[in-house]
Amino acid sequence: MEHRGISQGDHHRVLHEIKLDRQALIDFYHMFPKETHLPWNEFKLKYNSNNPYRRNLTDKFKMVYAPAYEGKELIDYPIIQELISKFNFRNPLIVTDVQILTYDAGFKFKTHIDAEVNWSMFIPLIPKDGGEPLVYHQGNNHRDPGPEIYRVHYSIEHPTLTT
């Protein structure tokens, strides 16, 4: 089964109530020089020196390390604060809760289980079509996640909440 546009399933919901200023977010992303795009493993070490190395996440999977640009965390920028203000989070967000992920050409996620994540909110900016879909599998075994349940093609107009 494939979900596109305004949709909801067992593990996702497109938050159609929240309209994004996509161009403003793209402009914000482009503000950060390529030198701030660190490989995932290197980025994680900036916040936790004991973070284990993940060999499946190659140097083509990166995250913007905002402090390398102006010394501020992503969460400290007004555009991010304005976005956060649209939600009523039970617990205040911390600096590592807001991330900009980037993928170099040719990067593809391998089938995996996100053990560290309870939920995520995705706001794809580039490419224009929202990129590769998120694929849910039936099982919870890291070595064999089981058959595919469904795919979610991210909305580019509204955040997509996933579990």
PLM regions and their residue ranges:
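Non-heme Fe(II)/2-oxoglutarate
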Residues: 1-91
